[in-house]
C-alpha cells in the first residue's frame, strides 16, 4: 500500500505490557489532551506513537491512565476479566476515530481486529455518521474463534445509548 502512494496506519491500545523504552514510544502532545466522554465521565486521551522505519509506517498507541496504562490485555493478574472492558472498548473506538479526525486523515478502509476494536464500526456508523470525513470509509472486521470466557457489564447497552446509539443497533447485546 505504502509503495503505491497509500498510507497504512496502525492503532492499538497502549497496554501496560508494552515497553515504551524498547519500542521508542513518545507522546504526541498536539494529538493528546482530547477528553472522551465515556458514560458521562471525562476521560483524557493520551496518544503515543512509534514507527516502523523499514515499512515507513506509524503505529499509534491509544493510552489512558484508567483503562490501559498499568493493565494487561483483557484479564488481570488473577485471570479475571476487567470489569470495565466495555468502557475500554468504547474508549478505544472513540479514541481512534478522534485521532483520525485530528490527523485530518480520511481513511479509505478501516480494518478492525479483536475485541477491543469491536465497537469501532458501531461508533463510526452511528455516533460519527454525519461526519463527512468518514463518508466513503469502508470497514472490514476480522473475526476469530478465540472466545472470551465471561460477560460484559450489564450496563454496556446503557453506556452505548448515552452516546445516542439507537436500540435497533444494540439488539445483539441484549
Label every model-predicted segment.
Residues 2-174:
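Catalytic cores of nucleotide-sugar-dependent glycosyltransferases that transfer UDP/GDP/TDP-activated
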Amino acid at each position: 500500500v505504502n509503495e503505491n502512494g497509500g498510507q497504512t496506519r496502525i492503532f492499538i491500545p497502549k497496554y501496560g505490557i508494552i515497553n515504551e523504552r524498547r519500542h521508542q514510544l513518545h507522546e504526541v502532545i498536539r494529538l493528546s489532551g482530547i477528553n472522551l466522554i465515556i458514560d458521562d465521565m471525562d476521560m483524557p486521551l493520551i496518544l503515543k506513537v512509534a514507527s516502523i522505519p523499514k515499512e515507513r509506517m506509524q503505529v499509534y498507541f491509544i493510552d489512558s491512565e484508567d483503562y490501559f496504562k498499568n493493565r494487561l490485555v483483557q484479564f488481570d493478574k488473577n485471570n479475571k476479566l476487567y470489569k470495565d472492558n466495555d468502557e475500554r472498548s468504547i474508549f478505544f473506538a472513540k479514541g481512534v476515530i478522534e485521532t483520525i479526525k485530528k490527523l485530518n486523515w480520511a481513511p479509505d478502509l478501516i480494518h478492525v481486529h479483536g475485541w477491543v476494536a469491536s465497537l469501532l464500526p458501531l461508533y463510526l456508523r452511528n455516533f460519527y455518521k454525519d461526519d463527512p470525513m468518514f463518508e466513503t470509509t469502508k470497514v472490514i472486521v476480522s473475526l476469530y474463534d478465540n472466545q472470551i470466557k465471561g460477560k460484559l457489564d450489564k450496563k454496556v447497552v446503557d453506556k452505548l445509548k448515552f452516546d445516542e446509539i439507537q436500540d435497533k443497533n444494540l439488539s445483539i447485546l441484549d
